[in-house]
Swiss-Prot record:
HAMAP family: UPF0173. This is UPF0173 metal-dependent hydrolase Exig_1934. GO terms for molecular function: hydrolase activity. It comes from the Bacteria. InterPro entries: Metallo-B-lactamas, RibonucZ/Hydroxyglut_hydro, UPF0173, UPF0173_UPF0282_UlaG_hydrolase. Signal peptide: none annotated. It comes from Exiguobacterium sibiricum (strain DSM 17290 / CCUG 55495 / CIP 109462 / JCM 13490 / 255-15). The lineage of its organism: Bacteria, Bacillati, Bacillota, Bacilli, Bacillales.
Length: 229
């Protein structure tokens, strides 16, 4: 299985002929090296509705026929656009052709902002994902603050790889992410959601060094760099 980081919180997964995209944000990210029209997708997993996590979801889904997996409200909204969707909600699990997806809680918000109309439409709760693929467990926290129930995930799942936001301001920062990593006890932690904008500039190398200091492994992936599980 190959997992590739594309900047912000965007991750693609290739496994047994299946292509999964988490939080596609390519066209709006100046640092992105991949164009949305070049993305292969069978399933698109959305943690929430903010533009920096789903900006390219509609275009990719239309081009590929991919099924979008999201919370009930967000999935229903996207179904009105004629897209294939699979609605879920917090705590629910479903087995897809590529593996199991469990939707986890996240402490954040979820909305679609139309600046032209000056409207904000809330889209249900934000989420994270616990994926079980090829007997490996991957946790994508989405956008979230630190919360104590992360310890439950660490206790009940043998997490091989965790994608944790470190940008601060909108999500937990490096210090809280270190606490999260300790609770999750993932074998490897990859920082995400940083450096895309000035408000979330962080030193990912320093974060990984601090992970090492607390006995854990961190890996700050470059844009379009992959990791094999």
């Amino acid at each position: 299985m190959k997992l590739t980081y594309h900047g912000q919180s965007t991750v693609t997964i290739e496994t047994n002929g299946h292509h999964i995209v988490i939080d596609p944000f390519f066209s709006g990210n100046d640092q992105a090296m991949t164009k949305p029209e070049d993305v292969k997708a069978d399933f698109i997993l959305l943690t929430h509705a903010h533009a920096d996590h789903m900006l390219d979801a509609e275009d990719i889904a239309k081009a590929t026929g991919a099924t979008i997996v999201a919370t009930h409200e967000l999935a229903t909204y996207l179904s009105f656009k004629g897209l294939n969707v699979h609605p879920m909600n917090l705590g629910g699990q479903f087995e897809f052709p590529f593996g199991k997806v469990k939707m986890t809680q996240a402490f954040h918000s979820s909305s679609i902002i139309d600046e032209k109309k000056q409207t904000i439409t809330y889209m249900g709760m934000p989420a994270g994902f616990l994926l079980t693929i090829e007997d490996k467990v991957i946790y994508h926290a989405g956008d979230t603050a630190l919360f104590g129930d992360m310890a439950l995930y660490g206790a009940h799942y043998d997490i091989d790889l965790a994608f944790l936001p470190i940008g601060d301001n909108y999500t937990m920062g490096p210090d809280d992410a270190l606490v999260a990593a300790d609770m999750l006890q993932a074998k490897t932690v990859v920082p995400v959601h940083y450096d895309t904008f000035d408000l979330i500039k962080q030193d990912a190398a320093a974060f990984c060094a601090n992970l090492e200091a607390q006995g854990q492994t961190g890996q700050a992936l470059k844009i379009d760099e992959s990791i094999e599980l």
